[in-house]
Regions:
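N-terminal capping/small domains of soluble enzymes
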Residues: 1-77, 114, 122
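Active-site beta-loop-alpha junctions enriched in small/polar residues
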Residues: 1-3, 34, 77-79, 138-140, ...
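Active-site glycine- and acidic-residue-rich loops that bind
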Residues: 8-9, 115-119, 124-126, 158-171, ...
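Structural preference for beta-strand elements that scaffold enzyme active sites
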Residues: 27-28, 71-75, 132-134, 183-189
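Aromatic- and acidic-residue-enriched carbohydrate-binding clefts of CAZyme catalytic domains
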Residues: 36, 49, 84-106, 145-163
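Short, electropositive alpha-helical surface patch
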Residues: 48-59, 84-98, 187-199
């Protein structure tokens, strides 16, 4: 973490850090959290997977990991309300408005764009040569924020019941399955750590 370039492109430092794990014998090597939207950046030096300008570095990384007989997986991430204001140069976004963090609710169209961008990031990872992706739905980040009844107060199809609160996640999963090869690995990271959220 915190080693990539400001525009989300892979740095030599992060390339070395990750490929050392594969070279050391890890059966599976996963990137650190890679943000799928610029507004979803969670920390300085975060790897990005939201633009084709990042594709060359991702391709180089996937190839190097796999050259050591390690499975290459990209972790897809959106920080949501946990994005620092100064880092994204504006208010962070979330499932609903949140006074404590100063985050604003995504419109329904913006939610659909988040879903599209997660799917596009998975497609980009596949193009780069990764064997699969993991959706970061833990640690109070955006997917977790949608799942939380305490944070998600939406009245559209992405709020209310558990099925609706999980709709962002299930639509991302369905979109990846529809657009990537059947053998492309897909995992979801969930955590019992709730960061004060009721799920």
């Amino acid at each position: 973490n915190c080693q990539s370039n400001d525009d989300g492109t892979l740095s030599d430092e992060e390339f070395k850090w990750l490929t050392m794990r594969a070279e050391g014998g890890f059966g599976l090597t996963m990137t650190c959290a890679a943000h799928v939207q610029a507004v979803g950046r969670g920390f300085p030096g975060q790897l990005g997977i939201f633009g084709d300008n990042q594709l060359d570095g991702l391709t180089r990384l996937a190839s190097a990991i796999k050259s050591h007989d390690s499975i290459a997986v990209a972790q897809l991430h959106h920080a949501g309300m946990r994005s620092p204001h100064d880092l994204i140069e504006g208010p962070p976004v979330s499932a609903s408005d949140d006074e404590e963090t100063g985050s604003r609710a995504l419109s329904t169209d913006e939610v659909k764009q988040v879903i599209t961008d997660f799917i596009s990031a998975a497609i980009r990872a596949e193009r780069a040569g990764f064997d699969g992706v993991e959706l970061h739905g833990a640690h109070g980040y955006l997917i977790c924020q949608f799942l939380s009844s305490e944070i998600n107060h939406r009245t559209d199809e992405y709020g209310g019941t558990l099925d609706n609160r999980a709709r962002v996640l299930t639509e991302i999963i369905d979109g990846i399955r529809d657009n990537c090869a059947s053998e492309f690995l897909l995992g979801v990271r969930l955590s019992p750590e709730r960061f004060g959220m009721d799920l």
